[in-house]
Structures are given as C-alpha cells and as structure tokens.
Amino acid sequence: MLTAPDNNHRPLFAAKDIKPFYLEHGPKIFPHHSGLGGTIIANLVRSLGGPKYDGKYLHEVVREKLGEIRLHDTLTNVVIPTFDIKSMQPILFSSYQMKKCSYMDAKLSDICIGTSAAPTYLPAHTFTNQDSQGNLHQFNLIDGGVCANNPTLVAMNEVTKQIIKQNSDFFPIKPLEYSRFLIISIGTGTARNEEKFNGETAAKWGLLDWLTYNGSTPLTDVFTQSSADMVDFHLSAVTQALHSEDNYLRIQDDTLSGTESSVDIATKENLQKLSEIGQNLLKKSVSRVNLENGLFEPLANGETNQHALTRFAKILSQERRLREMRSPHTTKNKKPLVF
C-alpha cells in the first residue's frame, strides 16, 4: 500500500501512516472474541468451523483505500508473493512479470487481500482478472508467507532475472554480482527465546494440538519461522562470503514474549507495546546470523539499526543522482528500483 499512488502521483501512504492505520483498523480486522471457558476455547471452537475471522472489514478497508489502482500503477517496482491453493503453486505479482503476462495486472486490493489470507485466520481470496485479449484468469489465493515468509530471496531473484535479460535498469551488473545489491529485510518479530514448546510435550501431540496449543499455532509457527530463518541464513552466508555483509541489513527482534508475538491480538495495549518495541529496535545494534551456531547476534562495531538505515538511504540517494547524471532524459520518469 506504500507504493500506491494518490491523485497527484505521490505515495498514497507514508511510512509514518503505518502506526495510525494499525491502531485504528487492527482491532476491527482482528476483533477480540470470548465465550464459555475463555478466549482460547472460544477461538478453538471458531477455528474448527472455519477461519478465525471473516475478513469482511479488512476487505472493506483495503478496497476503500486502493480503489481501482492496479499493479502497473505502483510508484516503485514491486514483487508480492502469494500462493494459489487451486494450482498448488506460488504466484508472484511482479512489476516486471506483468509486462509479459497482462493477466497478472490485477487490482492491488485483490493482491493485498490474497497475500494476507493466512490459513486458519482469514479466508482464501478468489477473483478473476482479464488479460489484454479479453480472456479471464482465475486466482485462488492464500497468504504468500506459506511459500515465502521472508520474501527477500524472491525480490533478489526478480532482479537477477532482469539482469540476465540485460534490462538497462541494471547495466552493467552481472547476474550473481551480489556485492552490488543493497538489501533491507524487515522482520515482524519472533518469540524464539520464549521456548514455548519442547520435544517432550510435542511428542504427545495429535493433529489438533499441532494446529492449536495454548493459544498458539505450532504447525504454522514451525513452517513460517523455519522458512524465514533459512532465507536469512542463506543471505548471511552469501554476503559474508563475498565480503559484502554491510550491504545486507536484517532488522528483526527475536525476544518477543506473550501476546507480543501473536499474529492477531490487536488490542490497544498490545499494539502500543509493539509500537514501543519497534521504536526501541531502531536504537539496538545491527545484528547478524552467526554462521557457527545460527543465532541472531549483535555486531561488535556498535552501529545501530537507525544509523544503518540512514547509511543505506544516503547510498540510494547517491545512486539515484548518478543515474540521473548519466541519463537525464531516460531516468526522469523511471520507477525507483525498490522491492
């Protein structure tokens, strides 16, 4: 939604609008339910009969904000992973792919609703889109996190494909010249240090326990966490091997606990707590995966996440100026290469 244009072809939302948006709409997207025996039992009963939430308010808000804006309208190049439950394969809505496959130029509202349809939490999203020949194509989408919970590699693969095709936007970079990549990867926090589960307990679980246990969703947590961690580990290994680790910034907090790590507890108190955690995260030292033990550890140089983001912003600004100097007539109206 940050890349959607307003009527003046400026961003519809700024980063500063994210917090107020969640504070206003979060409690309505994820309403608190209680029932006989308390919230946990009420949620369990609801989950057995369908998605935990009907998604109606989320759909309403997204459609109201994004209207008729389509993928080709975005102010930056984007790639948005989803998963098609009918064809059982990932679907990537990419600014570059769309130019070749016109049926991928869907409404941003449909793409956003589809990629946020987390299994057990929100319903799958089905819609059709017309290609340039008038043919209808159907999509049956669920949350892209099931295939790319950390979509960093997805974005890098899109860039690599364009380099192979000799797209002038990336000249003269070579396909695997990762030292020329500038990567910012922002996580949503984990409760790794809380150690909610253990082998002795899990050994006794049946299907229902794996799906929901003490207010958590173990099976979902395991798949999403491992998927994100493997991407981070891979990128850390590659960038360190190429001596370009300063070009990869992973911002993540793995010290969450209790309701802080919940997917859907959107009470005012919890959202304020998460906001404070985010602010404090800016002041923390840049951390990186230790390739020996797999732990996310702060670096010794003392650079904070805030300083690292400022450094990246300066590099991007300089790169933009250089491109404009080299080709002032062709770059003026090009989209920034941000994924």
Ranges and model annotations:
Residues M1-F339:
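Conserved catalytic cores and adjacent C-terminal regulatory segments
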